Curated annotation (Swiss-Prot):
This is Trigger factor. Residues 163-248 form the PPIase FKBP-type domain. SUPFAM superfamilies: FKBP-like (SSF54534), Triger factor/SurA peptide-binding domain-like (SSF109998), Trigger factor ribosome-binding domain (SSF102735). The lineage of its organism: Bacteria, Bacillati, Bacillota, Bacilli, Lactobacillales. It comes from the Bacteria. One of its GO terms (cellular component) is cytoplasm. It comes from Pediococcus pentosaceus (strain ATCC 25745 / CCUG 21536 / LMG 10740 / 183-1w).
Length: 435
C-alpha cells in the first residue's frame, strides 16, 4: 500500500492510495459470488453460472464497482493510517485508475482534524472561590426548610396576597374568541410564581373569595403560540378559595421534624452549615476546573473548526437533550409542541456553544498527546465499573456498548482535565480584578 497526502486547505487535502491486485482479486471474487445468486442464464440453474461464462457474457469489469465497494473501507483505513491523518467526515472518493491486471488508484478529498498549537495549560491563573458560610446563609436555608414544612390553610375574610394560593376558574378570549389552553376549572395558582402571562397574577391580588375578576393582559411577543403573540386578551376569573402558608414554629420540634438525626434547632443549624459548606467546596472545585480548562482553550491556537465537527457536536447534543426528555416521559413531538419550537430551533440554540465545546475537546486531546497520557488497564476497568454503577448495567454490557478505545479516550481526557485543574494557581478575586 502506498498512500500520498497533499494538503489543499486549512483542514482539507487529497489522499491518493492504491488497492493491490491481491485485494482486487478478493473483492472481485466476493462481488461475483454475490452477483451470480441473482443471475438467470440459459442452460444453468439460477445462481450457478460458471465464472468463465459470466466473464465471457458480461466481462470481469462488470464486477468492478461492487468489488470497489467491498475493498474500499479496508483500503481507506489503511491509507489514512499510513498517511497519519485523522478524518472528521466521510471522504469524497474518486477512481483515478482502474485497469485490469493493475493496482487500482483511488483518491479521496478528506476533511481532517485541525492542528492545535497549545499555549499555557499548566499553572493557569484562576479566581479562588470563597467557601465561607455566613450565618445569613444558614438562616436562609433554615427558612427554606420551614417553607417546605408549611401547610396551606384557608384564608377567610381577607384578600389574596402575594404568595397565597388561589383556586380559580378562568376563561380567556382574544377579541371575544376563545383560544386553545385559555380555559380551566379549579386551577391552583400561586400568586407571585410568574407561571402565568405577565400581569395576570398581579391583578388577582387584593380580591376575595367568590369574587369575579376581569383580568386584562397582553401576550408576550415571544409567546410559544405564534397566533397569540402580542395579542390583548381578557380572562374572566372566578376565585373559589384563597389559601395561605402557615409556617411551623422555629423550635426544637421543627428541627426534629425536618431531620430525625438532630435533637435541637441548634443541631440543625450546625448540620445545615456543614451541608452548605460541602456544596460550596464542590462548587468551588467545579468553578476552578471550568475556568482552568477554559483558560487552556483560550491560550491555544486553532485556525479553523471544520463544519463537519460542529454538525457532529450539535447532533450529539440534540440527541442527548431529547433522550433526557424521553427519560422524563416527554417524547420529542410532545416537547416541541409544549415549547412551541422545532428541532431546527433546538439545533440553532445548541449550536451557540458548539465551537467552544469542539475546541475544548481538541485542546484536551492535544494535551493528552503532549503529556503522553496513556490510561492503564486498571484505570479503564475502574471507569467501566463506574459507568456500570451509574447506569445500572452489568460491566459486560458496558464493554459491549462501548469500545475499549472509546473508554480509554474518555479516561485520558479526564486525566488531562485533572492535570490542568491541579496545576492551576488560585488567586483572590481582588488580585485578579487588578490585572
Amino acid at each position: 500500500m502506498t498512500a500520498k497526502w497533499e494538503k489543499t486547505g486549512t483542514n482539507e487535502g487529497k489522499l491518493t492510495f492504491e488497492v493491490g491486485t491481491d485485494k482486487i482479486k478478493e473483492g472481485v471474487d466476493k462481488a461475483f459470488d454475490r452477483t451470480k445468486k441473482q443471475l438467470n442464464v440459459p442452460g444453468f440453474r439460477k445462481g450457478h453460472v460458471p465464472r468463465q461464462i459470466f466473464n465471457k457474457m458480461y466481462g470481469e469489469e462488470a464486477l468492478y464497482q461492487d468489488a470497489l465497494n467491498i475493498v474500499l473501507p479496508e483500503a481507506y483505513e489503511a491509507a489514512i493510517k499510513e498517511a497519519g491523518i485523522e478524518p472528521v467526515d466521510q471522504p469524497q472518493v474518486d477512481v483515478e485508475s482502474m485497469e485490469k491486471g493493475e493496482a487500482w488508484v483511488l483518491s479521496a478529498i478528506v476533511t481532517v482534524k485541525p492542528e492545535v498549537k497549545l499555549g499555557e495549560y499548566k499553572g493557569v491563573k484562576v479566581i479562588k472561590q470563597s467557601t465561607r458560610v455566613t450565618s445569613k446563609e444558614v438562616d436562609e436555608e433554615i427558612e427554606k426548610k420551614r417553607e417546605q414544612q408549611a401547610e396551606l390553610v384557608l384564608k377567610e375574610g381577607k384578600p389574596a396576597e402575594n404568595g397565597d394560593t388561589v383556586t380559580i376558574d378562568f376563561d380567556g378570549s382574544v377579541d371575544g374568541v376563545a383560544f386553545d389552553g385559555g380555559k380551566a376549572d379549579n386551577y391552583d395558582l400561586v400568586l407571585g410564581s410568574n407561571s402565568f402571562i405577565p400581569g395576570f397574577e398581579d391583578q388577582l391580588i387584593g380580591h376575595n373569595t367568590d369574587e369575579d375578576v376581569d383580568v386584562n393582559v397582553t401576550f408576550p411577543d415571544d409567546y410559544q403560540a405564534e397566533d397569540l403573540q402580542g395579542k390583548d386578551a381578557l380572562f374572566k376569573v372566578k376565585i373559589h378559595e384563597i389559601k395561605t402558608k402557615e409556617l411551623p414554629e422555629l423550635d426544637d420540634e421543627f428541627a426534629k421534624d425536618v431531620d430525625e438525626d438532630v435533637d435541637s434547632l441548634e443541631d440543625l443549624k450546625v448540620k445545615t452549615k456543614e451541608e452548605i459548606k460541602s456544596r460550596k467546596i464542590q462548587a468551588a472545585s467545579d468553578a476552578k476546573e471550568t475556568e482552568a480548562v477554559q483558560a487552556a482553550v483560550d491560550n491555544a491556537e486553532i485556525a479553523e473548526i471544520p463544519e463537519a465537527m460542529l454538525n457532529e457536536d450539535v447532533d450529539r447534543q440534540v440527541n442527548q437533550y431529547l433522550a433526557n426528555m424521553q427519560q422524563q416521559g416527554i417524547s420529542p413531538e410532545m416537547y416541541f409542541q409544549l415549547t412551541g419550537s422545532s428541532e431546527d430551533q433546538l439545533r440553532d440554540q445548541l449550536r451557540e456553544g458548539a465551537e467552544n465545546r469542539v475546541k475544548t475537546t481538541l485542546v484536551l486531546e492535544a494535551i493528552v498527546e503532549a503529556e503522553k497520557i496513556d490510561p492503564s488497564d486498571d484505570e479503564v476497568a475502574a471507569e467501566i465499573k463506574d459507568l456500570a454503577e451509574q447506569y445500572g448495567m452489568e460491566e459486560k454490557a458496558v464493554r459491549s456498548a462501548l469500545s475499549e478505545d472509546m473508554i480509554k479516550h474518555d479516561v485520558a481526557i479526564k486525566s488531562a482535565v485533572e492535570l490542568i485543574k491541579d496545576s492551576a494557581i488560585e488567586e483572590p478575586k481582588s488580585k485578579a480584578a487588578k490585572k
